[in-house]
């Protein structure tokens, strides 16, 4: 069960803020439940954990088993919401060192999320002499980064296996009916999975977009979905007391309007790093428009206490922290006793790393709050697939609420098009000739 502890923000708020924000939350909640707010056509994720396509879900499981049986590596090609959620779940539940561990599942390499020649070359070298499959994820099939990467890996597969066997090793997650990737998949006989029309990329981790690579990594997607459904039912409640997403969204909204413009997501587990990257895209793209929105950042404690800790403690007071806390680790490592005690740490001998970490958490919390930084605590209880499914849904629902509280569309991202237009023009894409001339002059080329 996800719990949101707001006790460490109360002294920073105008009280009682709940009475002021609850009517707005009620409206936002209704928009999500009924799909009748701005961007309501993209709220398919709200009831997805209950209403997902069971037939496709079984095909996802079957494809994952096939990949596990015939491939030592799976190359996942996608950018943004097409890969961050899957990578976040895999690293959180398996390990950031997943590819280095002994296992009966394939290594998973994420590519097509940038334009680095070095990263592309390295990924191609990693599958040399290794049986591999490809999961290419793109609704349109024309997004530059994944489309370019797919050209390279499709060619690599076809050279190694021939076109027929290569086709059996390519899984395309794309639009159900149209688009360049769908057409290519139909023409070549790739197995396809659907990016739903009513779910945007950053909300799609619990669709085939995330579930196929997650299942290929051996993670129990039944547990992931059941956790999400449990949280969906919890988030259907229309009040702050019963709905943790209301509490989180309401607190963020109030802190934002009190001048706290930056939210730092913190966790004490290195495995949470890419879940934080997913969270940053989720909130950054959903809220950051019309000159509004919190700036989402993330830190990994305790490592970043030795870098960002100084700023958080004594820098500009325009931020707050949201700290994700997991329950006890399954691995209870105890500090050994050292006869010489040269490091002076024998006072820790016999104590578990979990115990030490908890004292670091509590000490940091007190220091930051006393230093003028409000802290929201999100308690997860445990770190397993069921809990993580609930955490994903919790963050998604709170994000939808947050967008509506700010009176923006939480489901579009019009600002992303600006760089794309310039990039296409500079690359010489047909139809961008006039813009290219303007940009070349500005760049002084």
Report residues per predicted region.
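Glycine-rich phosphate-binding loops that contact phosphosugars or nucleotide phosphates
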Residues: 65-238, 425
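Glycine-rich phosphate/diphosphate-binding loops that line cofactor/substrate pockets in enzymes
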Residues: 59-72, 123-131, 252-261, 312-317
């Amino acid at each position: 069960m996800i719990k949101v502890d707001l006790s460490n923000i109360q002294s920073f708020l105008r009280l009682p803020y709940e009475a002021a924000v609850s009517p707005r939350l009620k409206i936002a909640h209704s928009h999500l439940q009924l799909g009748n707010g701005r961007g309501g056509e993209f709220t398919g994720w709200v009831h997805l954990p209950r209403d997902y396509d069971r037939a496709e879900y079984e095909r996802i499981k079957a494809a994952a088993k096939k990949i596990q049986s015939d491939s030592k590596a799976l190359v996942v090609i996608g950018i943004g919401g097409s890969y961050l959620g899957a990578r976040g779940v895999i690293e959180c539940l398996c390990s950031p060192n997943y590819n280095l561990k002994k296992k009966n599942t394939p290594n998973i390499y994420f590519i097509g999320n940038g334009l680095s020649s070095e990263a592309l070359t390295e990924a191609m070298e990693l599958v040399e002499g290794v049986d591999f499959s490809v999961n290419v994820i793109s609704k349109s099939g024309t997004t530059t980064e994944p489309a370019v990467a797919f050209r390279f890996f499709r060619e690599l597969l076809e050279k190694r296996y021939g076109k027929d066997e290569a086709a059996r090793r390519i899984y395309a997650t794309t639009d159900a009916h149209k688009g360049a990737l769908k057409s290519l998949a139909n023409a070549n006989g790739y197995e396809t999975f659907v990016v739903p029309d009513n779910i945007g990329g950053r909300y799609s981790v619990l669709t085939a977009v995330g579930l196929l690579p997650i299942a290929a990594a051996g993670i129990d997607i039944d547990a992931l979905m059941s956790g999400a459904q449990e949280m969906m039912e919890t988030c259907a409640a229309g009040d702050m007391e019963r709905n943790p997403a209301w509490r989180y969204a309401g607190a963020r909204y109030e802190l934002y309007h009190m001048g706290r413009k930056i939210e730092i997501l913190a966790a004490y587990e290195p495995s949470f790093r890419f879940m934080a990257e997913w969270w940053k895209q989720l909130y950054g793209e959903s809220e950051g428009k019309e000159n509004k929105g919190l700036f989402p950042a993330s830190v990994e404690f305790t490592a970043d206490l030795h870098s960002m800790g100084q700023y958080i403690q004594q820098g500009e007071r325009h931020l707050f922290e949201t700290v994700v806390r997991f329950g006890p680790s399954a691995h209870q490592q105890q500090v050994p006793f050292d006869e010489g005690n040269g490091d002076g740490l024998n006072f820790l001998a016999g104590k578990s790393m979990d115990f030490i970490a908890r004292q670091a958490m509590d000490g940091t919390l007190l220091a930051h709050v006393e230093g003028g930084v409000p802290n929201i605590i999100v308690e997860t209880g445990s770190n397993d697939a069921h809990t993580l499914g609930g955490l994903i849904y919790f963050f998604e629902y709170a994000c939808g609420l947050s967008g509506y509280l700010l009176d923006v569309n939480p489901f579009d991202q019009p600002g992303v098009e600006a760089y794309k237009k310039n990039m296409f023009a500079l690359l010489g894409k047909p139809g961008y000739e006039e813009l290219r001339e303007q940009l070349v002059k500005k760049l002084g080329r």
